[in-house]
Amino acid sequence: MAQADLLGLRLAGTLGARDSQQPEVISVGVAVGPGYQNPLRDVSGLVPERVDMGVDFGGSGQVYALGDAVITNATGTSGGWPGGGWITYKLTDGPDAGLTVYLAEDVSPVVQVGQHVSSATVIANMFAGSDGIETGWAQQSGLSAESQLAEAGGVGGNGPFPTRIGLSFEELLQSVGVPAAPNRDQYPYGVLPANYPPIG
């Protein structure tokens, strides 16, 4: 029997046959990367802006957790970021279990510290502000914007320059269907610690 995988829709059966056998839908999914789903799948007008310490996006709508995780920080006041919210969560399953993800800037958290979440859990509402959002790998402490700098090998703070740790997260997002950032092909700065997904 022939099988086809089209954008997460898996069909089984004899495709194109003239007999009465119809393709059978086995599963429908958004996931492309192992164990993770597109956390920005319900963001309206999603615009990838750049890679820096993380990945910046414009748009508005609901933001989900990348995968199974536990919320480690959730505040509606800026944790050193412009625009508002600060959320971090530690992945508990999948190939990057143990790593922490941050979501910052124009977001309002709808989760609480200690809450267990999955890729089906809305963790924040992204609002159409002047800053958009930034998301990426966080240090374990994950308390403020400054916590990103040492790990990313930051280039004097925010700027239009991609970092290796930012590209690592951007490639993970691409693997689950998020559009690529426009500056991803520029020379990356900083270091990528050994325990983070390598850049492809």
Show where each model-derived region lies.
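Zn2+-dependent peptidoglycan hydrolase active-site motif and core
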Residues: 65-110, 127-137
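Surface-exposed, glycine-biased beta-strand/turn segments
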Residues: 1-86, 118-119, 166-200
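Acidic, glycine-anchored pre-beta loop/turn
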Residues: 109-117
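Short peripheral tails and domain-boundary helices/loops at the edges of structured domains
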Residues: 139-183
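Local beta-strand/beta-hairpin segments that build beta-sheet-rich folds
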Residues: 123-124
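N-terminal cationic amphipathic segment used for targeting or macromolecule association
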Residues: 2, 10, 15, 136, ...
